[in-house]
Amino acid sequence: MNYVLAVKSPVYGKQGAFLAYQFAQALLEKGHVISQIFFFQDGVSNGNGLVYPANDEFNLTQAWQAFSAQHHIPLHLCVAASQRRGVVDALTAKDTDHTNLAEPFSRNRVVRRRVSMSAMATVLLRTK
């Protein structure tokens, strides 16, 4: 089955983004395909390259980066949500020497429609 994942939980403070990461791994282990992962609302913090967890904490941003590189799955951030939360790239930063969008995350207005329309399921993980 082909999936598009949508993550709205922050990189730290709640466990939703980590659960989404584990879910994405489990999908691939079961032979499913993930076309892309879209981060919106507080989930855009997963693409902040300036997040530095404590040495004894799991670095979720780095985990998403490695996951994307290993499986060739694009990671997209909502443009409006990332702008509001200060996650900027060279195109949107007032000072292009100071950006914090982590590679390979990219900013997109919406989940790419062609890909998401071809997906068999779009999954939005919600946690309280």
Report each predicted region and the residues it spans:
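Helix C-cap/helix->beta junction micro-motif
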Residues: 30-31, 71
